A protein has these predicted regions:
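Leucine-rich repeat
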Residues: 1-465
Length: 465
């Protein structure tokens, strides 16, 4: 067998690059090369000489003796993280942050209040090489520390990814004006005391021409625009030319005000979760969808009911849900969403209705009025194919068979096929569906009933919430 030692340096480097690409996690990506440099002097020279193309990093954790060991290595960029687990001992993290001219990635999650203040104290000056920043305050903290305006020296020119969760940062819009290379922006679990108005958000986004993903999520439904101060629709829109994905969690009025001010011609994915509300009125959202080509046509929809939420998903690209527990509230809320064109249904042909089979299972009662189901189904006027799980077949078929005489096609007028996950022979569902088929046949509308085998793996991958 030929020895690897006969390989020239350029081929050896390609082997090392291949090894680098096989390491998927942050930990493995930052530590894989350290074993190579201890093999022999030649390997060490090849690795160190090619540090830029191999993207060599030094990882600093709460357990890394930074002050004792960091200078042993060449001055590679630093990755500062507590991925192995949150801790109150942040001395080594703080020591790593002192090397601000070398830090290019910070990933700190579930940081408690006192530790967070120590981190903030070391981040008031510019971090000129910083490209990735993830800060998550512990969800157990009742008093949220305020990030001062001087954070990062008010400048982040190389930052590409910014994730802030549970963070109170009034000066964020000013910082974003300097982050012109930002690709992903995640602002999640925003405290009510840290409310940012839609107008301020859009102003901050206006300079982010490279932004591809925006996640904006509020902690409470109290975070909503003041009705008295809501502005009329803007005659011009801020164009976000690179934006492809939006995640939003909040109230309907906020989303409506936000999209009234923007255009996103490349938007392919839109995922929305509303807090429970009585009315969903979003005229500007409808206009936004009409000028977003990739989201106008919806061919199939999955209506899914779960423990704490109900969701409508369209082709994995467009998802809107409502946070509430009781099934009757979920059905009623989805009907209101559909009536407000969340999502647009004029081109819909395939409708799936089922329960979520993973996660905590709900304890639903069989006391939902049939009229609630009929009101929801009434919104799907173009559906040709209806897919029903065992859990919901009995409920929905019972509601449909109440439509007799001239009302048989009042709901789902273009229906051609019903697909059932499972039906007990001779059971009530089979009898009721026979009546529905017969009644439709008399009115000149033929319906075929078939078996549906659910694709559980696809269901798991389908939803983002």
């Amino acid at each position: 067998m030929k020895s690897i030692d006969i390989l020239p340096d350029d081929i050896l480097l390609e082997v090392f690059e291949f090894c680098m690409d096989q390491n998927q996690t942050l930990i493995s990506k930052t530590e894989w090369w350290q074993s190579l440099v201890h093999v022999c002097r030649r390997w060490r020279c090849v690795v160190f000489r090619s540090s830029r193309c191999l993207r060599l990093r030094l990882r600093c954790t709460p357990k890394t003796p930074v002050r004792d060991t960091l200078d042993i290595w060449p001055p590679f960029p630093l990755v500062v993280d507590n991925i192995a687990g949150p801790t109150e001992d942040m001395d080594n993290i703080v020591a790593a942050l002192e090397r601000r001219d070398r830090v290019d990635r910070i990933h700190l999650y579930e940081v408690n209040g006192s530790s967070f203040e120590k981190v903030l104290a070391e981040m008031q000056e510019p971090f000129p090489e910083l490209m990735f920043l993830y800060l998550e305050l512990s969800s157990k903290e009742e008093l949220v520390p305020i990030v001062p305006d001087s954070f990062l020296g008010r400048s982040a020119p190389r930052l590409r990814v910014l994730l802030l969760e549970g963070i109170l940062f009034p000066g964020l819009p000013k910082l974003l004006l300097s982050a012109t290379n930002l690709v992903d922006l995640y602002l999640w679990n925003i405290p009510h005391s840290g409310y940012i108005s839609p107008d301020v958000v859009v102003t901050a986004l206006s300079t982010l021409t490279s932004l591809q993903r925006l996640d904006l999520g509020f902690r409470s439904p109290r975070s909503h625009p003041d009705q008295a101060s809501r502005l009329p629709p803007h005659p011009t829109h801020t164009v976000l030319p690179s934006l492809t994905t939006i995640f939003f969690k909040g109230v309907c009025e906020y989303l409506d005000d936000l999209v009234a001010r923007i255009d996103a011609p490349q938007l392919n994915n839109l995922y929305i979760m509303f807090f429970n509300d009585v009315v969903f009125d979003a005229p500007q959202f409808i206009q936004f969808i009409s000028r977003t080509p990739t989201l106008k046509a919806v061919e199939n929809a999955h209506v899914v009911f779960g423990h704490l939420k109900a969701i409508i998903n369209s082709s994995s690209r467009y998802e809107v849900g409502i946070s509430c527990r009781e099934l009757d509230w979920q059905v009623s809320s989805l009907e209101q969403l559909c009536s407000s064109h969340f999502p647009p249904l004029s081109t819909l042909e395939d409708l799936y209705i089922y329960e979520r089979l993973y996660g905590e299972q709900p304890d639903w009662q069989d006391n939902i009025e049939n009229t609630l189901w009929l009101e929801l189904l009434h919104r799907f006027t173009t559906v040709k194919n209806l897919y029903l799980s065992k859990e919901f077949a009995q409920r929905i078929v019972a509601a449909l068979q109440e439509l007799v005489g001239g009302r048989t096609t009042e709901v789902l007028p273009t229906l051609q096929n019903i697909f059932l996950e499972e039906v007990e022979p001779g059971g009530h569902v089979q009898e009721d569906i026979g009546r529905i088929v017969a009644a439709r046949q008399l009115s000149g509308h033929t319906i075929t009933v078939s078996h549906w085998k659910r694709d559980l793996m696809r269901e798991r991958d389908l939803f983002r919430w």
